[in-house]
């Protein structure tokens, strides 16, 4: 994305 905080790895980080 680019608007949400990066989630944990097991969630799939948004970068």
Swiss-Prot record:
Family statement drawn from the similarity comment of this UniProt entry: Belongs to the pyrokinin family.
Modified residues (Valine amide): 15
Keywords: Amidation, Neuropeptide, Secreted
GO annotation (BP), single: neuropeptide signaling pathway
Role: Myoactive.
Tissue expression notes: Found in the abdominal ganglia and perisympathetic organs. Not detected in the thoracic ganglia, subesophageal ganglion, corpora cardiaca, corpora allata, hypocerebral ganglion or frontal ganglion.
Subcellular location: Secreted
Name recorded for this polypeptide: Pyrokinin
GO cellular component: extracellular region
Secreted keyword on record: yes
Main location: secreted
């Amino acid at each position: 994305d680019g608007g949400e905080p990066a989630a944990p790895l097991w969630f799939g980080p948004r970068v």
